């Protein structure tokens, strides 16, 4: 049984009961509601944990963890460039199935620098500056041989420093 988006949201509402290491995580909320979204490959939420900010992903596709492990190995072998750090936490999220048995699921933490998504940044930065920052990011990705394969505004963060970095590496090559 795979966790649902509703279950993921419930787990984030009371992390100390559902997560092995992320029990002290604080999810992003709107009012009293935990903000969780769904992409093609994962459920995701923004969290604060140990004084740092992360995207927390619960993969909904079997190859996502394997792909992230591969990206991390390659990033360590070469210069990380604009890539953000990913940490796979194995058997992190606990689910109690209908038979009363515990099941554990892997999650991914991806470093999230302070900033805003590209789609929001267009109202705060000059378009020419954003365009140049995107070209620089693409050049840095090319220099380390990294192909994101789904680089669009929802997968790009503009850091407070103006540096542009990619998020969500499921489709990377």
Each model region followed by its residue ranges:
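Activation of the activation-loop gatekeeper triad in protein kinase-fold domains
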Residues: 168-172
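ATP-binding glycine-rich loop module of kinase domains
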Residues: 32, 40-85
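Juxta-kinase regulatory segment immediately upstream of eukaryotic protein kinase catalytic domains
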Residues: 1-36, 66-71
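Catalytic-loop of the protein kinase fold
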Residues: 142-159
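Conserved alphaE helix
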Residues: 126-140
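Conserved structural core of kinase catalytic domains
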Residues: 83-130
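Conserved hydrophobic "DFG−1" position in protein kinase catalytic cores
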Residues: 46, 112, 157-158
């Amino acid at each position: 049984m795979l966790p649902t988006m509703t279950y993921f949201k419930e787990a984030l509402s009371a992390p100390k009961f559902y997560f092995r290491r992320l029990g002290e995580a604080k999810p992003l909320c709107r009012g009293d509601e935990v903000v969780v979204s769904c992409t093609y490959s994962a459920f995701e939420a923004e969290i604060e944990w140990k004084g740092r900010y992360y995207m927390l992903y619960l993969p909904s596709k079997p190859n996502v963890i394997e792909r992230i492990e591969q990206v991390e190995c390659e990033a360590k072998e070469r210069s990380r460039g604009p890539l953000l750090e990913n940490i796979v936490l194995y058997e992190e999220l606990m689910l109690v199935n209908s038979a009363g048995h515990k099941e554990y699921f892997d999650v991914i933490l991806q470093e999230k620098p302070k900033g805003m998504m590209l789609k929001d940044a267009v109202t705060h930065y000059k378009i020419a500056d954003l365009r140049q920052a995107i070209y620089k990011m693409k050049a840095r990705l090319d220099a380390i041989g990294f192909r994101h394969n789904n680089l669009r505004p929802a997968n790009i963060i503009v850091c407070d420093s103006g540096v542009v970095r990619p998020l969500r590496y499921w489709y990377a090559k």
